[in-house]
């Protein structure tokens, strides 16, 4: 029974290519390549980054047990050796009585940047630093996300838009 199951899931074509659930491995590789490929050209990344300010206030907090939180309310979490850092909406942190000391705005760069792209973080972090703005960056699968102090949100957007416009000229 196990062999029949294995043969139905994974077969070998006459060309020697694997077939998984009826899809040729070449198709799967092309699909994954297209899905995985984001932009790597720095000048294109900068001029096309399209920063977007998300609604709401976000905070960084830490918890010992992530299971105590509703994961639908967690924007992201990262397991550190001390505890688990979570980024969540400020309102939810207040409801859960979590302590925080940094209220941030969330800016998403709407270009699909490759995780292998070189220089994008340095470029926008440098532009923000020149304007005296601290940033905390999360590189996710499709986009880069920037957290800046809530009080710096408008100034950060202006700085990012200026960087992008300068790259377009």
Regions found by a protein language model. Give the residues of each.
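Regulatory modules associated with amino-acid/nitrogen control
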Residues: 32-126, 161, 166-167
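Structural preference for solvent-exposed beta-strand-turn elements
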Residues: 141-143, 152
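Helix N-cap motif at beta-to-alpha junctions
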Residues: 90-93, 149-154
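A short linear hydrophobic-aromatic micro-motif
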Residues: 73, 132-137
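Basic polycationic patches enriched in arginine
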Residues: 17-18
